[in-house]
Amino acid sequence: MKNNNYQQLTRTFQRLSRFSHLSSIASWDMFTMMPPGGSAARGEALAEMSVLQHQILTDKKVGEWLAAAAEEDLNDVEQANLREMTRHYQQATLLPESLVEAKSLAGSRCEHAWRTQRPANDWQGFSANLKEVVKLSREEARLRAEAKGCTPYDALLDIFEPDMTSARLDVLFGDLKSWLPELLAKVVEKQAQRSFVPPQGPFPTATQRELGLEAMKMLGFDFNGGRLDVSAHPFCSGVPEDVRITTRYDENELLSALFGVIHETGHARYEQNLPRAWAGQPVALARSTAIHESQSLFFEMQLGRSDAFLKHLLPAVHARFGSQAAFSEENFIAWNQRVKPGYIRVDADEVSYPAHVVLRYEIERALINGEIEVDDIPALWDEKMQAWLGLSTKDNYRNGCMQDIHWTDGGFGYFPSYTLGAMYAAQLFDSAKTALPGLQASIAGGDFSALFDWLRQNIWQHGSRFSTSQLITQATGEDLNIRYFREHLTSRYL
């Protein structure tokens, strides 16, 4: 058989993809539908699945096939797939099975307890579980770093964002720090000159859900291959054929759930448009977490908070919640572009959002590199929040260092993806505007087809065929350039 070793690999990775499919849906269920009493058994079942996948991927035959397939006559896509297979294999073989299982169990325990500990502001209880997750994550980072010859944190960063390093992040975030605080202060000062009319609730959850579904429909979500549910923290999971997104509702606050849905719809459209011809293979997966976040932030911020989109969305708001003063066109746009530093990352405006990310990046990097301990987190969080946003989180763990789900299961290295994603989104939107004259008028008229076609051609259809750098350069003519993000914030808010 032609390319026999490569064919063996595709069959193996197809199996892995199917197990991953089941794990993903079981995890979604754990976060949305599972009764509390099911937590321990579900955690054990998911850990067993992690071990099974690890065993398949680390079989020595896989290593032999990879070496032999490198000599076979493969086309461009097959070569890209082999590169991604090799990366997955190398990442898996660095970890002993016992660590994979222990980390999965500790993560499930920590996340499940966090759901009740966060509302109770119980840092003491949470930190005990987090210490175990950090211990195991440090062990994983140490093993990966020894093999890669890098810092422990960079070894975890590479899982989410291949080829990114903390040295490069420090340059990008250093640039951000040189102008963002001043820009933020100017915007806050400018907006203090005008009055805003806040939307008056209550906004019934069922009606909010209807509005969210309407927004998903506008944005091209395929309901035949996906659904919307409720969870403690908004997320997107599942598989390209069956994408699950969630949001959370507050009957006194309309826009948090709505823009949570719009954000997750960006993730979902990317997943739903990944290359089906390569389904089940690593090359068909999303390129990286930053590219994934670029799509959600493209939808939520570049498109969703634009004047043109907000004008188009407003009739759907009027149809469900009437035409109170807050929902005049001028006020609705102003309210959705309001910049107000706050405690919660997922509710942050796009000017102050990077501050939340840089703060978390600096803390998690120091934590994984062994420069600080879990007990140091609350004081550092408070110090950095005061420096960036002038807000104190002292003793307010719920709205400070306990607010995110990411660290509960050892997702250290993920947070930078949000701000990298915002930078990529600004650069992509700038290129789309150049390529599509009359784009703003089309958006105001509710016609997003040309924009989505552009994303499909330039990002979605390529999966992991190209490196992040190649993908962005092909789409925009240059590698990541922070200038577009700065120009976007300046033109929208000043």
Where are these regions (language model features)?
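All-alpha helical catalytic cores of prenyl diphosphate-utilizing isoprenoid enzymes
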Residues: 173, 177-180, 205-209, 215-229, ...
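Post-HExxH zinc-binding segment in Zn-dependent metallohydrolases
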Residues: 285-326
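Contiguous, non-catalytic segments that form substrate-binding/exosite surfaces or channel walls
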Residues: 103-254
